Amino acid sequence: MRKMLSFMMTSADGYHADPGDALDWHNVDQEFSQFALAQLREAGTLVFGRVTYEGMAAFWPTPAGQQSDPDVAKAMNTTPKIVISRTLAQATWVGTQVISTGAEQELAKLKQQPGKDIVIPGSSTLTASLLPTGLLDELRIMVNPVILGQGRSLFAGADMTSLKLLKTQQFTSGNVLLYYQPITN
């Protein structure tokens, strides 16, 4: 059975985007890029919510995305992708399948297939909706050393979920990566 994990960036006060949905406060450097590439290499499938998908699809296939980090761009562009959306009719990013209904069942089937991990990069709304299903095996939350004061809460609308800390990883940038296992009842 494949493992499904979600990776998200957050501010120290729990926001994943500022009030204008900007992400320029993300504390990324060469060490982060190496981590991101290693995580992508663990992935057999990437799963996105619509908003995150649209942002990624507008960047990684472009010359700017490929120049920013060629190895990460290659991994993002060649790994099979799924976007969960009730409103997106068609995906433009090569290698992307749209699931508009029955997402929980489709993801459960995908987990049963052999292969590498299923990784959800970003997509906080999707992650929050999957927490009560028991499909998520791991949450990887990277806390950036910044306080936004306001913005979009990392787990807005999520039901209370207990987490078991698996490990932590400190980055020289000041980021701290928390590895959690959701505890489902």
Language model feature labels by segment:
Residues 1-185:
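Enzymes that bind and transform nitrogen-containing heteroaromatic metabolites
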